[in-house]
Design a protein with these regions (language model features):
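Structured beta-strand/loop patches that form or line metal/cofactor-binding pockets in enzymes
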Residues: 16-63
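Alpha-helical support elements that line or immediately flank enzyme active sites
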Residues: 72-84
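Short, thiol/selenol-centered motifs that function as redox-active sites or metal-ligating centers
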Residues: 64-70
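Short, low-complexity, polar/charged sequence segments that are solvent-exposed and flexible
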Residues: 36, 78-81, 133
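Short C-terminal domain-edge/linker segments immediately following a structured domain
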Residues: 48, 78-80, 90-92
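C-terminal binding/interaction regions
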Residues: 1-22, 83-147
Length: 147
């Protein structure tokens, strides 16, 4: 990887942005959360269902974001099925800390790709959107499952 001196938008970011898995809404999800980045207006909606073991079993997204938000959504969606709500929350929290310069890259496939964005704090919100929405939706789905 080129580190923080690498281009912010590169071929891999653009490829991920163009190939978002699960990029359609679920018909009647257990939970749905929309997150918006106030600076750029990027929006990500995450719909999800949990199985009887409390793991993500179905996922749907609506992504209206910049290439960084789209690429982050792609990485989240490609690896969310089968995850527990705690894993999504841990990934969200680790991503937030890393972008703030307070930790190592998150243990989620591909997120190191955003290293060139570290000095660009105005871009961090759009990178976090999908992870924030997925973690919150998973928690809402769990609450609904328990109720």
């Amino acid at each position: 990887m080129g580190g923080v001196t690498a281009p912010l938008y590169n071929t891999e970011i653009l490829r991920l942005a163009a190939t978002i898995p699960h990029h359609e809404r679920l018909e009647s999800p257990m939970a749905s959360v929309e997150k918006r980045a106030p600076v750029c207006g990027s929006r990500v909606t995450v719909d999800l269902d949990l199985d009887e073991e409390g793991r993500v079993s179905a996922l749907g997204l609506l992504v209206r974001a910049c290439a960084l938000g789209q690429a982050s959504s792609s990485l989240m969606a490609a690896n969310a099925i089968g995850r527990a709500p705690e894993e999504l929350a841990d990934a969200r929290d680790a991503l937030t800390r890393w972008l703030a310069g307070e930790g190592a890259p998150p243990d989620w496939p591909g997120l190191g790709l955003f290293e060139p964005a570290l000095p660009h704090s105005a871009r961090h919100a759009s990178i976090r959107l999908a992870f924030e929405a997925a973690a919150e939706a998973a928690e809402h789905a769990r609450e609904r499952q328990v109720a």
